[in-house]
Regions:
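Mid-domain Rossmann-like dinucleotide-binding core that forms the NAD(H)/NADP(H) cofactor-binding site
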Residues: 118-120, 124-194
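NAD(P)H dinucleotide-binding glycine-rich loop of Rossmann-like/cofactor-binding domains
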Residues: 33, 45, 56, 78, ...
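Short glycine-centered segments of the SAM/dcSAM-binding site in methyltransferase folds
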Residues: 84, 142, 166, 232-233, ...
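Short amphipathic alpha-helix with an adjacent loop that forms part of the alpha/beta core around
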Residues: 195-206
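Glycine-rich beta-strand-centered segment in the early N-terminal region that forms part
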Residues: 21-39, 50-92
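C-terminal capping/lid region of NAD(P)-dependent oxidoreductase domains
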Residues: 206, 291-306, 313-332
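Glycine-rich phosphate-binding loop and adjacent beta-alpha segment
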Residues: 219-296, 324, 331-332
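NAD(P)H cofactor-binding loop motif with strongest signal on the N-terminal glycine-rich segment
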Residues: 147-148, 216, 239
């Protein structure tokens, strides 16, 4: 089958189109004809060998897919051929077919096309799990969302507003800031301005925010700690700024604050010890919550652009140059 192939560690744009063996159907799995696949900043790290998880080479990158079931193993009764599904997989999304354990496959909500299903898996799954399950964000709390113009950040803004929180969002372009206001952010800051603590404290009357949603890391993390109110929580979910910060715990003591990590990949088996089976109830709960957001209209998955597989380099350029407002999707 045709696929985008990573044979050795290299930049995403330097990968090559090629052929990969058609995966074998195994007990407990379904075969999916892939119609759309998501790529992200993390996809680039994976193919460069810089991610914490290193697939055996050669492999096709891509972990978020949507498509139609074309075959099911004899012991699978949750799905049948023709079902519209989505899944977060180990790798292999940028290919024509994938064979996936049925326990990590979910129906595509009614009314969404193939590309629109992609943000639900990582962007909305990460944000729902982090804000609802981990931070326990409550109505009336202030939440500061960094990187709010990207897929994960947009989802965090929508979910926080749905929960009744007050949102301060940061983004780097006029277009992104306008979209965030449209989606309900109470205050939108220019992320090109290095100092965000001053306006955050002004907006909150000197109190600070209850929750920080940080997908950037680096200096943003350190300044964010100083934006927390007493008893505040800082969610660290990624390091798109490139630097993994270290923590001086004295500030946690002074503010009675909590720093908490959230790795959505843990729920899908992306850890040294594969926990996907044990964590199925928690994963199902998050995905049910995400589907509920779509049904209620609280979530409007935003796809920035859709590219054919042949234009994979152009697709990733949108991410590398930070032009994407929402998700980038490739159709294999």
């Amino acid at each position: 089958m045709r696929a985008l192939v990573c044979r050795d560690w290299r930049p995403f744009e330097a990968l090559e189109l090629g052929e990969m063996p058609v995966p074998e159907l195994r007990p407990g799995t379904v075969r999916v004809r892939i119609r759309a696949a998501g790529i992200s900043f993390a996809t680039g790290l994976v193919v460069e060998g810089k991610y914490q998880r290193k697939p055996p080479r050669p492999f096709a990158p891509g972990t978020e897919i949507s498509g139609e079931v074309i075959e099911v193993a004899s012991d699978v009764d949750r799905f049948r051929a023709g079902d519209r599904v989505m899944a977060f997989i180990d790798w292999g999304g940028l290919a024509e077919e994938a064979v996936i354990w049925a326990g990590q496959v979910y129906p595509v909500p009614e009314g969404l096309d193939w590309p629109e299903a992609i943000p639900l898996l990582s962007s909305y799954g990460t944000s729902f799990g982090a804000l609802v399950e981990r931070a326990r964000l409550m109505a009336g709390e202030w939440v500061l969302v960094h990187g709010a113009g990207g897929g994960v950040g947009l989802a965090a803004v929508e979910i926080a507003k749905h929960l009744g929180a007050r949102v301060i969002a940061r983004a780097g372009t006029d277009e992104k800031r306008a979209w965030l206001k449209e989606r309900g952010a109470d205050h939108v800051l220019d992320s090109r301005e290095a100092d965000f603590k001053t306006p955050v404290m002004e907006i909150t009357g000197g109190r600070g925010v209850g929750v920080v949603y940080d997908s950037l890391g680096g200096e943003v993390f350190h300044q964010s700690l100083r934006c927390l109110e007493i008893g505040g929580r800082l969610l660290t979910i990624g390091y798109a700024a490139g630097e993994i910060p270290t923590l001086g715990v004295n500030l946690l003591l002074l503010k009675n604050a909590t720093v908490m990590g959230f790795n959505w990949g843990t729920y899908w088996g992306w850890t040294p010890v594969d926990e996907r089976v044990r964590l199925t109830p928690e994963r199902d709960r998050v995905m049910a919550g995400v589907a509920g957001l779509v049904r209620s209209g609280a979530a409007r998955p935003r796809v920035h652009a859709v590219f054919p597989l042949e234009r994979f380099a152009d697709a990733f350029a949108e991410i590398r140059e930070r032009r994407a407002l929402g998700r980038i999707v490739i159709t294999p």
